[in-house]
Regions:
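Local sequence-structure signature of Cys/Sec-based thiol-disulfide redox active-site neighborhoods
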Residues: 1-25
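Long, contiguous secondary-structure blocks with strong helical propensity
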Residues: 1-4, 32, 82-83
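Generic recognition of short, well-ordered alpha-helical segments
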Residues: 18-21, 47, 51, 71
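Short helix-loop-beta junction
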Residues: 27-30
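Thiol-based oxidoreductase modules, predominantly thioredoxin-like and allied folds used
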Residues: 32-44
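Structural micro-motif
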Residues: 50-59
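Non-catalytic, surface beta->alpha helical segment in thiol-disulfide oxidoreductase systems
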Residues: 61-85
Length: 85
């Protein structure tokens, strides 16, 4: 099963730590997987930093941008309650 939730983060980001806690908790409650991606590392680092650098942390659900800066747990639960697109 592939992760429905992607969390884009970067090192030293305190909001990223807060977002990770929310994403971990909600995904665990619903039996969903999530993937965390450091936008400063890997072959796509430049493109991801250009796209999301000012909005980090960013969450995607089913490949679509869902939230940035802060993750609302109720909104995330609602999005994950829908069937994947």
């Amino acid at each position: 099963m592939s992760a429905r939730v992607t969390l884009y983060t970067r090192p030293g980001c305190h909001l990223c730590e807060d977002a990770r806690v929310v994403v971990e908790r909600v995904c665990a409650e619903l039996g969903e997987e999530y993937a965390e991606v450091d936008i400063t590392a890997g072959p796509e680092a430049d493109a991801l930093t250009r796209r999301y650098g000012e909005e980090i942390p960013v969450t995607l659900v089913d490949g679509r941008q869902h939230d940035f800066w802060r993750v609302d747990p109720d909104r995330l639960r609602a999005a994950l309650g829908r069937a994947p697109r």
